[in-house]
C-alpha cells in the first residue's frame, strides 16, 4: 500500500512496534503492553485438556479485543478504509464510523459456508456455534448500540475478504460467497537477504525440510520437552527433516 502511494497506519500489540516501524510503516499500539507469549503459555500450562486450554486462551484474547475497542475506535477515525484482520478488530468500529472495510482471513475455517444447504439439525447446531463465536464481538456492538450479530459473517466485510494462501496449498471452499478471494501467499522479495549460516548449511545438507509452526501452542511458560519429543520422534519415524517453531525453553 505504501509503495502505491497510500498513507497507512498499522495498529497492533505494543510488542510489534520496533518490527513495524523498522519497515517504515506508521504504528499505533493497541491493547495492554504485556508479554502475550508468556500469558498464553501460563493459561495453557494450567489446563491439561487441550480443548479447554484453547478455549481459555481464546477467551483471554477476546477479552483484550473487547477492552481495546476505545483505542481501536480512535485509531480508525478519519481513515478512508479499514483492513480488518482475522481477529475482526476494527470491524465494528469501522461500521460505527461509516468507513468501508476489507477483511484479511488467515484461518479459512472461520469463513461461513453461506452457499451450503443445511439440514434442520445442522442449522440448529450451526446457529449455536456461530452465536458463541460472535458473542465477544456482540459485547463490542452493545457498547455502540448496534444490533447483535448472529454470526461472524455479519461482522466481516461484504466487499472483499482476502485470503493470503496459495490455491496450490489449499482448495477454495465451493460454499463460500464470491467475495472471499484466494490471493496467494504475501511474501515481499528481499534481494539482499542472507540466511544465518547455520540455517543455510542445514538447508544445503539434504532434502527440503518441513516447517512445523504451531503458533501459540509452541509458547512455553516452562520447558515442555515431552511435547517437543513427540514431534521430533514423528519426523524421525517418517524420515523427514524439519524446522520447528518455538519451544525456546525446551
Language model feature labels by segment:
Residues 51-59, 113-144:
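Alpha-helical membrane-targeting segments
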Residues 1-6, 19, 234-238:
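A short, Lys/Arg-enriched amphipathic alpha-helix followed by its capping loop at the start of a domain
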Residues 80-81, 160, 209:
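Structural motif
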Residues 9-54:
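Conserved nucleotide-sugar phosphate-binding/catalytic loop shared by glycosyltransferases and other
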Residues 171-250:
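Donor-nucleotide binding loops and adjacent catalytic segments primarily
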Amino acid at each position: 500500500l505504501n509503495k502505491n502511494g497510500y498513507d497507512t497506519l498499522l495498529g497492533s500489540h505494543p510488542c510489534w512496534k520496533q518490527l513495524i516501524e523498522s519497515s517504515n510503516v506508521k504504528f499505533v499500539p493497541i491493547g495492554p503492553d504485556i508479554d502475550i507469549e508468556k500469558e498464553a503459555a501460563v493459561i495453557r500450562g494450567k489446563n491439561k485438556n487441550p480443548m479447554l486450554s484453547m478455549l481459555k486462551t481464546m477467551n483471554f484474547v477476546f477479552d483484550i479485543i473487547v477492552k481495546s475497542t476505545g483505542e481501536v475506535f480512535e485509531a480508525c477515525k478519519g481513515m478512508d478504509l479499514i483492513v480488518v484482520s482475522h481477529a475482526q478488530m476494527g470491524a465494528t468500529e469501522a461500521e460505527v464510523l461509516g468507513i468501508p472495510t476489507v477483511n484479511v482471513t488467515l484461518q479459512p475455517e472461520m469463513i461461513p459456508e453461506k452457499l451450503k444447504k443445511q439440514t434442520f439439525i445442522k442449522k440448529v447446531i450451526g446457529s449455536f456455534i456461530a452465536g458463541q463465536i460472535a458473542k465477544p464481538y456482540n459485547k463490542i456492538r452493545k457498547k455502540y448500540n448496534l444490533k447483535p450479530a448472529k454470526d461472524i459473517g455479519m461482522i466481516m466485510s461484504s466487499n472483499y475478504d482476502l485470503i493470503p494462501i496459495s490455491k496450490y496449498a489449499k482448495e477454495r471452499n465451493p460454499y463460500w460467497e464470491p467475495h472471499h478471494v484466494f490471493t496467494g501467499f504475501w511474501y515481499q522479495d528481499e534481494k539482499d537477504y542472507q540466511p544465518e549460516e547455520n540455517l543455510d548449511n542445514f538447508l544445503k545438507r539434504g532434502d527440503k525440510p518441513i516447517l512445523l509452526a504451531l503458533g501459540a501452542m509452541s509458547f512455553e511458560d516452562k520447558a515442555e520437552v515431552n511435547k517437543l519429543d513427540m514431534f521430533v520422534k514423528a519426523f524421525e519415524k517418517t524420515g523427514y527433516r524439519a524446522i520447528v517453531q518455538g519451544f525456546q525453553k525446551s
